[in-house]
């Protein structure tokens, strides 16, 4: 019969051995992609994936891999999650009859404080006040901002952001909010054409063929224009269908789908801002759109001297984004652990 002390030490050994394995199951609720050699070495990009329609949960990890692997940026992807900590694009954005409305949640927003750039891809979120405050601290810091697709209407509950006592709308920061679909939602697609007058802008370096199967957003009234201080970079022409070679809709004028501006913070710091209303998971299968956004990453951090027309924007590994939309069962969209998107 083993000595009691032998049994005691055996139990301790088993506990110590099991400890790390058990702890390994509790990985952080975000994804990290280490940077390395490249122009972005030593710079940190945080990407926020928290929409319900355009598969940001697939698009942002793909973009993070491109930026870290080909360009050297350290990338962190934060997700909107449910009560179980799962990435959940199915969470409602408005109260539903007879159901408790639950606030959205993005773990890890504290990391915005150490970011050199944040790429926003939320949609109509109602976040707890402490999380909204973390976002405001970043956007008022003077650091650069990139917003993709639904990012221009990313927050339903207003951010607690005031300058000189006046409430600041998120749309003011990024240069215009969503005002409707310019054409037919889920029926049109978009051909992007660089604005001729901006052909030499660094963000357009090497950018030519842009197409995505999402439709064009309207961000200003008919007959109007982008807000003062915004400079259009890409025109979006609605097409009569969702195929790359479909003809343009002759009844719909092209509208800006990408622009840049500078945001003046409460302390008069100037932040570089880039908005693309293209950027769905399937849109980003287009190399031209990926190059536009990667170039914008460099420009936003005042690294435009490192932009070249040949830097790789190739997808790393496999990328098979699901289609956009809210028919979650048909599309196969269910809550998943963060690790499923690695």
Model-derived features: positions:
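Extracellular/periplasmic catalytic domains that process cell-envelope and extracellular macromolecules
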Residues: 37-42, 110-114, 138-141, 224-227, ...
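Helical hinge/lid and interdomain linker segments adjacent to catalytic or ligand-binding clefts
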Residues: 31-33, 46-48, 52-154
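An acidic, glycine-rich "communication" segment
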Residues: 41-42, 148-245, 309-342
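Extracellular ligand-binding/catalytic regions of CAZymes and related secreted enzymes
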Residues: 24-40, 58-59, 69-70, 81, ...
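Hydrophobic h-region of N-terminal signal peptides that target proteins for export
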Residues: 13-24
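Active-site rim elements
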Residues: 50-53, 186-192, 204, 208, ...
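Sec-dependent signal peptide recognition
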Residues: 3-14
